[in-house]
Amino acid sequence: IGGPVSNVLHINPGSAAERAANILKDADVKVVAAFNNISNSHLANIPNPIECDCLICGDDGKAKEIASDIIEKIPGLKAIDIGPLNKAHLIESITPLLIGMNIKFKSHYGGFRITGIDFE
């Protein structure tokens, strides 16, 4: 495909997560978009704490609950449900921004934390 890794590659229509859900629609599989904005360097160093938020979305409440439980077993990581799977394109679009920031600031561990909102 080419181009800088910090550019967004739009998948029409929707997102990679929606495309996966469409491919799997005849199987008894529930798709949850997660971990898009968590550095692979962080994930490779579990159980070290990851001081980031993990945005998730999906169409099945139970599947999102399972994903959230897995995410929150990782020290420091917090799952934030942003809604249905049609929001996955938003999460996927953040990833190149985060990669670009990590490149610019010579880091492998940059991430996002949502502040100012009471999620309880």
Kindly label every feature range from the protein language model.
Residues 26-27, 73:
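Oxidoreductase and adenylate-handling cofactor-binding alpha/beta cores
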Residues 1-2, 38-40:
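Short, catalytically relevant binding-site loops at active-site mouths
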Residues 43-45, 92:
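Short, well-ordered secondary-structure micro-motifs
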Residues 3-13, 18, 22, 45-62:
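Short beta-strand and adjoining strand-loop segment in the mid-core
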Residues 25, 39-42:
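Rossmann-like dinucleotide/flavin-binding elements
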Residues 52-120:
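Active-site-lining helix/loop region of Rossmann-like oxidoreductase modules
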Residues 28-37:
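Conserved beta-loop-beta element that borders a ligand/cofactor-binding pocket
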